[in-house]
Every structure is written in structure tokens, then in C-alpha cells.
Amino acid sequence: MTQYTFSPKDFKAFEVEGLDQRMEALNDYVRPQLHQLGSYFEEYFTTQTGETFYAHVAKHARRSVNPPIDTWVAFAPNKRGYKMLPHFQIGLFRNQLFIMFGIMHEGRNKEEKVKIFDKHFDKLTSLPSDYSVSLDHMKTEKHYIKDMSNEELHAAIDRVKNVKKGEFFVARTLSPTDKRLKSDKSFLKFVEETFDEFLKFYQ
């Protein structure tokens, strides 16, 4: 029995119609793992950074009609919330598991915080070939860094400084059938490897 990883069946929770029904499916098939990942990586981030990190599993409490198309656990050194801070995420869409670090459009002083990617631009462009950029956390669409020019990357970072809705995340994704999701051991190894890379941009 696995504790941390997700099977193709778990992703199918997003196919369930209706808000209450989908939330029930997420509670049964997805949220238990998110809570386990939350506990595991709270300790990881606290150890790695020297700050006390807190896990925030998405509640989707404001929804009254439309069922969520994704769900996640986020990590930040704030017990009350994470959206205002640069933060880490592990989450799922129907056809994608994502791991991300970056700055949401709701971020406090985001025009200053995003400069960490300017400061470490060489590290950004040196990330392995399966790392990507997300410019909107609400969409599955991500752009492989290897396929972006330096000008495009700089423009994406600058958009956070100049556009209210601008956001920037570095990301790594898996499909629901990826072999690295087959066991807790391989999945946790993949996530830790990814967060090890993301921590280069955390300060």
C-alpha cells in the first residue's frame, strides 16, 4: 500500500462530475497522499532552509458551483498562508502531476521577490531539460526552459514586475502513467531531486 504517490486511477477523480461528488473523490483518492506529502516535506524544507515550513493542502472552500480542475499541497514558512510568499507546490491536474516553485500573482512585493530569478538566471537556464516554466498556475500549459530564448525568459520574469496578474513558477511534471509514480520510493526521490534544484532560487 502506497502512502505518497498517485496511481492513474487517482487522477480520474477529476473526471467526476459535480462539485460535491468531485470533492468526495478527491478526499478519497488524492487528499490522503497530499497530507502525507505535506508532513514529509514540511520536515524536508525545515531541515534544508533552517526555517519552519508549513504545509497547506488546498481546501477549495470558496467553491460553490464549479468543481476544481486541480488540487495541491503548498509549502511556505508561514502557518497562516502561502499565496503571499514564494512557495513550493506538489499538485495534480487530470493529466499532469506538477511540482513547482515560484511567485503567484497574489504575492506580496512580488516585483522584488521575482528578482531572485534574475539574480540566478544562469542557474535557471542550466536546469535539466525536463524543467519548465509556468506563467499561470491555473493552467496545465508549461514551457520547457530549453525551448525558451533568454529574451523570452527575461520577458516572463519582467511580466511579474509589471503586470498585476503576472506570475512565474519553475516546474517539473509527470504524466499519470510515468514509471516514477509506481512506488513511494521512486516518487519521493523524484520530488526531492526537484526541490533540491528549486532551492537554488529560494532565499
Curated annotation (Swiss-Prot):
InterPro entries with a match to the protein in the record: UPF0637 (IPR009403), UPF0637_domain_sf (IPR053707)
Gene3D superfamilies tied to this protein: Protein of unknown function DUF1054
Covalent S-S links between cysteines: none
Domain of life: Bacteria
Signal peptide range in chain numbering: none
Similarity comment: family membership: Belongs to the UPF0637 family.
Protein name: UPF0637 protein SERP0693
Species: Staphylococcus epidermidis (strain ATCC 35984 / DSM 28319 / BCRC 17069 / CCUG 31568 / BM 3577 / RP62A)
